[in-house]
């Protein structure tokens, strides 16, 4: 079911991969910095969520403007035969992927702060979860592009 949905919307895979990787990397960088400074879980969460909202919004708007510019250029040249899809959908896919995968490095901190689950090694958990997120991104890309799972 999910695989069919993804294949029906494969023209947006680039935005998904771009948003997901940037979301997880930048959020992980915030978590790593805050963890290195021994900041409280609450502060790590505030910084991480602020990054998700601001950077995700920026990426979504950037994707929209980039797609819009490509469409305008295509209309000007009339020679471009590549379908670029809706700029609005591209922006939403980039933003959604940024948020959905970008939150992964914060899961251990969210679990402790909101669910009161004591996780002794939150930063190591964040590393592991971010690694799993990258594997997930590769598997998603592999399923759409029909490339080998290791190559993706």
Residue ranges, per PLM feature:
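Hydrophobic, small-residue-rich transmembrane alpha-helices and their short perimembrane loops
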Residues: 1-109, 116, 120-133, 141-143
């Amino acid at each position: 079911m999910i695989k069919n949905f993804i294949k029906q919307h494969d023209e947006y895979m680039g935005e998904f991969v771009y948003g997901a990787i940037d979301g997880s990397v930048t959020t992980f960088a915030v978590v790593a910095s805050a963890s290195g400074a021994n900041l409280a879980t609450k502060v790590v969460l505030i910084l991480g969520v602020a990054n998700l909202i601001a950077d995700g919004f920026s990426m979504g708007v950037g994707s929209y403007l980039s797609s819009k510019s490509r469409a305008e250029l295509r209309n000007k040249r009339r020679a471009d035969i590549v379908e670029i899809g809706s700029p609005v959908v591209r922006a939403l896919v980039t933003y959604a992927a940024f948020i959905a995968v970008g939150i992964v490095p914060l899961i251990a901190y969210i679990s402790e702060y909101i669910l009161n689950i004591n996780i002794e090694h939150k930063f190591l958990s964040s590393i592991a979860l971010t690694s799993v997120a990258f594997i997930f991104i590769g598997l998603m890309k592999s399923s759409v592009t029909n490339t080998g799972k290791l190559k993706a």
